[in-house]
Amino acid sequence: MMGSEAHDKRPPMLTSSNQDLSPHLADVGQIKHYFCGCCAAFNNVAITYPVQKILFRQQLYGIKTRDAILQLRKDGFRNLYRGILPPLMQKTTTLALMFGLYEDLSRLLRKHVSNAPEFATRSVAALLAGTTEAILTPLERVQTLLQDHKHHDKFTNTYQAFRALRCHGVAEYYRGLVPILFRNGFSNILFFGLRGPIKEHLPTATTNSEHLVNDFICGGVLGAMLGFLSFPVNVVKARIQSQIGGPFQSLPMVFKTIWIERDRKLINLFRGAHLNYHRSLISWGIINATYEFLLKIV
């Protein structure tokens, strides 16, 4: 009887302990999506930044890959990683928000709008996460200025670039916000909506290395597709954000100017898209594989 009583008394003690720990475990579970997104971004930027600089030059000036590489060689190795701080800050924070907010908002919407289709709640969560990411537009703005060789003589680091914009008012930091909002919302909806279905069509993974390969392929395919589809928007964004001061031009107006400058040819508008395709393939492969790997071990 004593053994039976002791056995009967243990469960309440364990239940109480679990109740005390459950809020802390829930906090860790929620934070890990932000942490894993941040680490995935850091890993990606450190590896792919030089390729991003080549791509940026092509988007801004409509030049060939070889000419963009020659520009970077002329700038010297010392300037190769010039301007990496803004994208490092921007990408780590952006991807932390992208993955973390998407999970939090999806959970929140499912809880309060339980009768809505899952696809709808996840799409809204992805759109809201993308909109929130746009708060970090100033970092993307400064990155654009630091990568443009026309501004090399005006400032040499992130702090100086921020100071150069300050005298033009807060709005100057958010020049190019509209194309960023459009790009983020569109890309997030498709990324989170298609990530699961694409992975389901890949061969079944039985080992950790196979899971890593599948996650890389899934992220890479999505990244390449979205990078190609949003390429014209990024071309317009680069042109808008390379300007300091002056009137704020609308997205259609800037697009029309670029379209005329590039002889009204779609192939000229997509100059650099092939490099962007390969960069996005590698970048989002790294991001998705790193994110999913960290989720399993954190």
Swiss-Prot record:
Q: What is this protein called?
A: Mitochondrial nicotinamide adenine dinucleotide transporter SLC25A51
Q: Which GO terms describe its cellular component?
A: mitochondrial inner membrane; mitochondrion
Q: Does the keyword Transport apply?
A: yes
UniProtKB keywords: Membrane, Mitochondrion, Mitochondrion inner membrane, Repeat, Transmembrane, Transmembrane helix, Transport
Q: Where is it mainly found? A: mitochondrion
Gene name, per UniProt, is Slc25a51
Q: Identify the stretches annotated as Solcar repeats.
A: 28-108, 117-201, 214-297
Q: Where are the transmembrane segments?
A: 34-51, 85-105, 117-136, 180-200, 216-236, 269-290
Originating organism: Rattus norvegicus
Q: What does this protein do?
A: Mitochondrial membrane carrier protein that mediates the import of NAD(+) into mitochondria. Mitochondrial NAD(+) is required for glycolysis and mitochondrial respiration. Compared to SLC25A52, SLC25A51-mediated transport is essential for the import of NAD(+) in mitochondria. The transport mechanism, uniport or antiport, its electrogenicity and substrate selectivity, remain to be elucidated.
Q: Which reaction does it catalyse?
A: NAD(+)(in) = NAD(+)(out)
**Entry GO MF terms:** NAD transmembrane transporter activity
- Membrane topology classification: Multi-pass membrane protein
> Which family does the similarity line name?
Belongs to the mitochondrial carrier (TC 2.A.29) family.
For the biological process aspect of GO, one term held by this record is: mitochondrial NAD transmembrane transport
PANTHER family in alphabetical order = MITOCHONDRIAL NICOTINAMIDE ADENINE DINUCLEOTIDE TRANSPORTER SLC25A51-RELATED, SD08549P
Q: Which domain of life is it from?
A: Eukaryota
Q: Where in the cell is it found?
A: Mitochondrion inner membrane
